[in-house]
Amino acid sequence: FTDAEEDARRRDFTMNGLFEDPFSLPPGRVVDYVGGVEDIRARVLRCIGEPDRRFEEDSLRLMRAVRFAVTREVQVEKETCSSIFRNAPLLARISPERIREELDRILLSPGRKRGVEMLVETGLMKHVIPEIYDMIGCTQPPQWHPEGDVYTHTLMMLDALGRDGSPVSLELALGVLLHDIGKPPCRQVDETGRIRFSGHDKEGSSMARV
């Protein structure tokens, strides 16, 4: 058995390490051993104790950090963020099913664009959908895509989802994330310099099914 403080210090992030005193009068007194109240007020996501140890204990916390950042609209504290970069390879320990659950929650959030950016920038996406990295720098015909490469276009599309107030299903969000995933392997430039992506729709469909 452990006491409440020891239990709190084993949790992942400070905002998840709070307790309610069931005997307090008036009821509702918050017991905070880890500075969670202050971090919630400051809108900061911070690991409890040593971040590296927390992510070593349960590497799915790496994905949970991104999910909380986008669903709670908080900033990841510097040491926690650095630890995510260092420990991204640990995500390979986690089953695809558990990773998929966290990805789904990110994509269903209005902050899905930021979530995908964070997964890419931290290196976590290498263990989720590594083909996303091939979109970066994959240029497109500027007359049709002045926004830039395939990755930039995909982020813009993710950001546009739900802007008109319409509901965003998981199928729609995944479809937008993967709709151009077949472009990088199909990219060709002809003798006139024209960029083509012949067959990218079929290639992308095959890749998405995998």
Which residues does each predicted region cover?
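Catalytic cores of the polymerase beta-like nucleotidyltransferase superfamily
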Residues: 1-210
